[in-house]
Amino acid sequence: MVKINGEELNIAGKTVAEYLATTKYDPKRIAVERNGDIVPKVQYADTVLQDGDSVEVVSFVGGG
């Protein structure tokens, strides 16, 4: 199980890019943290989520 934003999901073995494709997140407007480290956008397709990972997806919103 992978914990994403506090929710346990059975997505071990998928890449960050594969997970994001199943969500409504806009990859241009988010940051992904995996086990305390920011995942660079260029590595989303190569970063495989593993059992026990803790992931936070943070969305950026405009404002003023």
Question: What label would you give each PLM region?
Answer:
Residues 1-63:
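Ubiquitin-like/PB1-type beta-grasp interaction modules and other compact soluble beta-rich domains
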